[in-house]
């Protein structure tokens, strides 16, 4: 066998076997409910929660990796053992349910981890107990045949059937019809089993009633097909929404698994319950995603306001900067014109100074010639000349104080006049000439220095002008870029603003629709509360007769017939039988009146819905977002509501175990097993002829499904505005009243 490890043919055979085993397990789960035992392969997880599709995709034959292929082969063998063990455990649970005469088991806790041998032994023990239980009613068959009269036919073309025929069918059931849902097969045998528990003397005043059996029900009812079709359409819409939002879809995986295992056959009750649970997960995930999108929208609106304020500030800053640059350019132009004017003036002054310097040089030559003549006379005045030289040095150091130097020269001239009268005229002339020459020299030097400074300043001004022109060009280019960027940002901001305004308008419309739906729901809740108070008052009136609840009569239901029933009156130990019968008649009158009032309300509500559908009030959302086809129009949205009222499936039985009204209006204690209110009465709309009225007192347990129908009908107008949220609300409304039957269908959800 070692050479076969990793063989592709062997692995494909194992994968096929695993697929078949999983299909058989799903079929058993639909009849017995999911069993919660630890997995043999993965002890830390439940066997019913393993994702076989993901495991088969992971452990596959890889041509380039022999080690992984051999590991996958071993894992597939272990998975075959795990699935076989789970199949035995689920079959064991199904056999226990048959032995205890229960339709579906209650919610089971996680079972212990069992070995293969222990599981096989427990399965064999359960099978032996079932065989013993089926052999016990056989001795009573002859007595039932002798004491039970032949039943009369109730409809044309149908033969009469006796209770012994039904008992034989129960003890030796035939193979189920292919494609018939389990919800329409199993409940038939339960009332007949209950009838076997009473003595044979009770059949003297009884008569058998015709009912629809497995042989007559060749196809599933239209209501089941309609409900499942609507559920699949809604599931497709939910899966498409999850895919469009890039969200994981639990319903998509479960739908693929159901299609692989069931194909196009009708789904059983447990599969429909699991489908609804997975769909509820996806709807919850979508609601969380919508809340996150709303938070992002609010954050985007805040950012939009901030960007709008920032854009206004930038526009103001840009305008201020443009004004400052404009003023700076005007000032620069004015300074440039002033500098040009000063330059022309300086050029004219320099030309004038040059001509003056030439004339002064000629005068200086003449004065030098005259001073040479006067030098002979100036020998006597050397001391004064030294002082004059010192004064000349001081005059050279203090160029700016020209007037003070001239005053000092005049003082020196006065001193020279005082020193000698002889050289007064010569000294004064010499001083004047000297002062004039010195002033001319100083003036020439100052002019030259001023000219050099002006030339340097002119060069610096030229350089600064070039720099200013370059900076002005750069500023113009930058301003153009800033204007272009601001224009693009303004256009982008306007586009974003328009998009956000459109989104805001759509959200406001959705908000208005939700507010309208909330108002309608509140009005519906108030109306339902008033009806609940009335029903409680009527229930108190019925409870006021305690004698009616004594075990004085027993009902025997044949098959699924609830329109006609036989009552067997047994002698009581206390009271008068006539009084009890009169009180029973009074209570039956009260029940009939309650049913007539409820039928009147349902008829009025149905007429209102039809009027709204004819007026086109249900066309509020595009057809591609609804679960009904676009070709059906407004009337295509009403079949799911009607399917709720006539479906015998799990939707019709979910409210019955938790309804007090359905139990107290029967006028007798619940002597039969607790499954009786959930089997025959709710299934009558699927099997009874259309012409039979549903007015029998034994069908009073149907009042709770009618109430759920009223709740579904009143919320139909809100489905057109937001179908996803309404589905979530309807699922939450239906989930508290499912009772034990619904909890048995509900699988254990994995932690997200």
Curated annotation (Swiss-Prot):
Residues 276-544, 579-615 form a coiled coil. Residues 135-163, 316-336, 620-707, 731-752 are annotated as: Disordered. Keywords: Coiled coil. It comes from the Eukaryota. Residues 316-329 have a biased composition (Basic and acidic residues). InterPro entries: CCDC157. Residues 135-154, 628-648, 693-707 have a biased composition (Polar residues). Residues 671-692 have a biased composition (Pro residues). PANTHER family: COILED-COIL DOMAIN-CONTAINING PROTEIN 157. This is Coiled-coil domain-containing protein 157. It comes from Homo sapiens. The gene is CCDC157.
